[in-house]
């Protein structure tokens, strides 16, 4: 893999658009580890992470000043331009999520570590979290010090998917600050919704195309039983996104069910399954989901 150029974050070029063609071997995805290394249903979350082995590759920071953007603090070993459109967009992400999901604001600081090459990122993640599958980015929460600034971290690298990956991981972080827990499928579905550019209104063109090609059999009850990220493959991520998009954009009754469920999750990490609540409000959720997907048009 070729190294990302420092021009990614220079004062003359926008962060997201100065990236050339980069070959990727990492897939988007999530992981959750409990305090003793036991998997939990929180997406892309590692608790008790600080107890792991020291790393040979250092995480970014110390060479350049950190950049504070709202509740996010960015660290990199190359200069970061505060006026970059990416940072302006990320500064608006928490309010966008709060408004859409009817959730309160969280005040936790999220530390974001931007490696300047894929090699450095992979090396650090292999050394620090050797049991994790390869992913382009991770959200990490250390449960040892609740509400401390350093507890919430995002790790990623400056590749061509940086903008999408940061929206995705920071969505996890924002949800983590206000919810007591969130089912894996819902965590991923919401992150998949908000990882899209605001102009897309949560619509993922790639997911939509693949789901409409045929062979898609939605089964929310099955998806709700997926507890480990290792069992979340691309079809599961697509279906999770589809259900969230349907709830938020396809049916007013479904949106109310989701909003109520999220309110329950603020105090109760396990308020039961969403699927029975959805069936009680929507006569045929599967048929309604198909109709919703059929009506969508990819953004131009």
Where are these regions (language model features)?
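Internal hydrophobic scaffold segments of catalytic domains
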Residues: 30-35, 109, 115, 188-197
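Short acidic, Pro/Gly- and aromatic-enriched capping/linker segments at domain boundaries
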Residues: 45-66
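Sec-dependent bacterial lipoprotein signal peptides
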Residues: 1-30
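Bacterial Sec signal peptide processing site at the extreme N-terminus
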Residues: 28-48
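Acidic/His/Gly-enriched intrinsically disordered linker/tail segments
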Residues: 131-156, 160-161, 177-300
């Amino acid at each position: 893999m070729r190294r990302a150029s420092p021009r990614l974050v220079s004062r003359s070029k926008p962060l997201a658009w100065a990236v050339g063609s980069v070959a990727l071997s990492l897939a988007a995805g999530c992981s959750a580890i409990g305090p003793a290394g036991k998997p939990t249903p929180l997406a892309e979350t590692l608790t008790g992470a600080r107890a792991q082995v020291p790393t040979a590759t250092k995480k970014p920071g110390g060479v350049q000043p950190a950049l504070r953007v709202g509740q996010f603090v960015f660290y990199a070993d190359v200069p970061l331009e505060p006026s970059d459109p990416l940072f302006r967009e990320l500064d608006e992400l928490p309010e966008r999520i709060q408004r859409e999901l009817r959730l309160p604001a969280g005040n936790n600081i999220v530390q974001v570590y931007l490696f300047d090459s894929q090699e450095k990122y992979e090396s650090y993640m292999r050394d620090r979290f050797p049991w994790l599958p390869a992913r382009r980015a991770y959200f990490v929460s250390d449960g040892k010090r609740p509400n401390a600034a350093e507890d919430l971290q995002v790790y990623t690298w400056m590749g061509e998917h940086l903008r999408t990956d940061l929206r995705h991981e920071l969505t996890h972080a924002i949800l983590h600050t206000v919810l007591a827990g969130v089912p894996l499928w819902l965590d991923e579905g919401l992150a998949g919704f908000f990882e899209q550019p605001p102009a897309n209104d949560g619509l993922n063109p790639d997911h939509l195309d693949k789901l409409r090609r045929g062979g898609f059999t939605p089964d929310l009850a099955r998806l709700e039983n997926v507890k480990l990220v290792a069992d979340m493959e691309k079809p599961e991520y697509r279906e999770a996104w589809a259900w969230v998009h349907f709830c938020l954009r396809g049916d007013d009754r479904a949106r109310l069910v989701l909003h109520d469920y999220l309110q329950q999750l603020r105090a109760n990490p396990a308020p039961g399954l969403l699927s029975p609540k959805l069936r009680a409000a929507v006569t045929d959720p599967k048929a309604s989901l198909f109709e919703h997907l059929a009506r969508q048009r990819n953004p131009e």
